[in-house]
């Protein structure tokens, strides 16, 4: 497409998003000190930061659901390379007090074979971890699909899982096709393709519906899953850059009143989110009123956002998560 034929995209200022607390039987009743939230009846296992039902909290679109906003303004939010009008990423915190089911996610091809819009590749950034915390990630080298099937049938699947110790600050990549399970002992910031397609392989006899045949079909014996070493650059630390998303730590100079936030590359702008893993910040621009980012809060930065500066209000650990379009690169 030539530059002359590109559509005119309206500017959209950054905005805060209200979190959504999602019930999970394996979650926690009390999310303090992470969030000032105590569950009424059912435990909370996930805090969705960018779910379709999350509400826009600030700006001219305050009160709308995030899903509705994506339907109404796909180009302003996602940029000129948007391939559809839906939200590309689901970002959430995960709080587990017991082992989650062993599961596997399909890739785009397999998900679409069974009528889904896309597969699910994801990553976990470890916000906190107890000593000896682990996750199950992938299969041991000598495991075959027949071993997996027999392990499901006789309750010994866990013996085939690769157990990965995790520490605060680890970025764990979980590509589609990787058998995995989150275990208790850590708090994870998950970034995933926006998809609810999960094939449950094994659930320790707890009665949840299993998808054994599809999970076996989706399983890859060898994947790229694992802890990704960070790439330290002068203006940011790249925790991961994948086909679907990038996750970066952004330093903010506390010796200055504010730091102008640059995009992660000179390519076509895309949607990104700013998450305060700790501390708080304020973003400001001549184009919009100052916007505060509280601890564990999130701000959406549309592709067509004006340039702004970030001020560290104390103890800021700033994470930027950006959508990627497969095949486009950055």
Give the predicted meaning of each segment.
Residues 1-143, 195, 204-225, 247, ...:
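Transition-metal
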Residues 91-93, 100, 122-125, 163-164, ...:
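His/acidic/aromatic-lined binding-pocket segments of jelly-roll/cupin-type domains
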Residues 100, 279-284, 298:
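Short beta-strand segments in beta-sandwich/barrel cores
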Residues 111-113, 179-184, 189-192, 261, ...:
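Short beta-strand His + acidic residue motifs that chelate non-heme Fe in jelly-roll/DSBH
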Residues 150-157, 280-283:
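Short, structured beta-strand/loop micro-motifs enriched in basic residues and often containing a Trp
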Residues 152-154, 160, 171-173, 179-227:
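An exposed, glycine/acidic-rich loop-and-rim segment of catalytic or binding clefts
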Residues 161-173, 187, 285-305:
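Short acidic-glycine-tyrosine-enriched beta hairpin
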Residues 199-271:
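C-terminal amphipathic alpha-helical segment
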């Amino acid at each position: 497409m030539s530059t002359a034929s590109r559509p005119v995209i309206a500017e959209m200022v950054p905005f805060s998003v209200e979190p959504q607390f999602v019930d999970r039987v394996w979650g926690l009743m009390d999310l303090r000190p992470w969030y000032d939230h105590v569950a009424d009846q059912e435990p909370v296992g996930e805090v969705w930061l960018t779910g379709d039902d999350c509400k826009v909290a600030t700006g001219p679109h305050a009160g709308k659901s995030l899903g509705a906003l994506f339907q109404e303004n796909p180009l302003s939010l996602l940029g000129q390379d948007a391939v559809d009008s839906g939200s590309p990423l689901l970002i959430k915190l995960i709080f587990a007090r017991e082992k989650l089911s062993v599961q596997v996610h399909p890739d785009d091809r397999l998900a679409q074979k069974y009528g889904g819009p896309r597969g699910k590749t994801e990553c976990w950034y470890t916000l906190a971890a107890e000593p000896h915390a682990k996750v199950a990630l992938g299969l041991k080298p000598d495991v075959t699909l027949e071993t997996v099937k027999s392990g499901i049938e006789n309750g010994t699947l866990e013996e085939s899982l690769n157990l990965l110790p995790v520490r605060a600050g680890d970025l764990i990549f979980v590509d589609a096709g990787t058998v995995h399970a989150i275990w208790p002992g850590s708090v994870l910031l998950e970034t995933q393709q926006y998809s609810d397609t999960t094939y449950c392989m094994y659930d320790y006899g707890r009665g949840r519906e299993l998808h054994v045949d599809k999970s076996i079909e989706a399983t890859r014996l060898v994947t790229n899953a694992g802890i990704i070493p960070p790439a330290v650059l002068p203006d940011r630390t790249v925790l991961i850059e994948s086909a679907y998303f990038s996750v970066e730590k952004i330093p903010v100079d506390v010796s200055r009143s504010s730091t102008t936030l640059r995009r992660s590359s000179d390519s076509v702008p895309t949607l990104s989110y700013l998450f305060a893993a700790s501390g708080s910040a304020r973003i400001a621009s001549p184009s919009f009123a100052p916007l505060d980012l509280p601890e564990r809060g999130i701000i959406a930065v549309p592709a067509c956002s004006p340039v702004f500066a970030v001020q560290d209000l104390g103890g800021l650990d700033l994470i930027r998560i950006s959508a990627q379009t497969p095949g486009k690169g950055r």
